[in-house]
Regions:
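Structural microenvironment flanking redox-active thiols in thiol-disulfide oxidoreductases
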Residues: 1-38
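Extracytoplasmic/secreted envelope proteins and their assembly/folding machinery
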Residues: 3-4, 33, 56, 112, ...
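Sec-exported extracytoplasmic/periplasmic mature domains
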Residues: 4-11, 52-53, 60-61, 120
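Loop/turn elements at helix/coil->beta-strand transitions in domains of secreted/extracellular proteins
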Residues: 12-17, 41-46, 73-74
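Solvent-exposed loop/turn segments at secondary-structure junctions
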Residues: 22-27, 51-56, 83-85
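Short, solvent-exposed loop/turn and secondary-structure capping segments
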Residues: 29-31, 59-60, 88-91
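Short, internal strand/loop/helix patches
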Residues: 37-69
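Thiol-/selenol-based redox modules, centered on thioredoxin-like
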Residues: 71-122
Length: 122
């Protein structure tokens, strides 16, 4: 959804994409993550394997995930261009997920609107 609603329609080089693969399902491993790169083939995308889930847990602390979850996975963030990354990730300007059916459930059009808003404020 993010690929076709956002990346295929927003061609700006101001958009930077970081795809973090983390082991959640039993079949998740580094090889599966390598194969999954095809899911986000955009040239602006950089792919990372979060083997120990440390980034997923750090990102999970920046927002309130549904159902008391602590690990951010199937979560999509928009960060302001001025966001500073240090020992802990910054708070996102906007985010959505695919973890539950609530007001932050991923909606490609809404997410695209927030990406466009973010690149206009740069």
């Amino acid at each position: 959804m993010v690929q076709n609603k956002v990346l295929d329609s927003v061609k700006s080089d101001r958009v930077k994409v970081y795809v973090v693969w983390t082991p959640v399902l039993s079949e998740d491993d580094g090889k599966a993550a390598d194969n999954a790169v095809e899911a986000v083939p955009d040239d602006r995308a950089m792919h990372f394997w979060d083997d120990d889930k440390s980034l997923g847990f750090s990102l999970g602390k920046t927002v309130t995930l549904p159902r008391g979850r602590k690990l951010a996975w199937d979560v999509y963030f928009v960060f302001d261009a001025k966001a500073e990354w240090g020992d802990a990730p910054p708070t996102p300007a906007f985010w959505m997920h695919q973890l539950a059916d609530d007001e932050r459930k991923l909606d490609g059009e809404k997410f695209k609107d927030q990406v466009l808003k973010a690149i206009k404020t740069r």
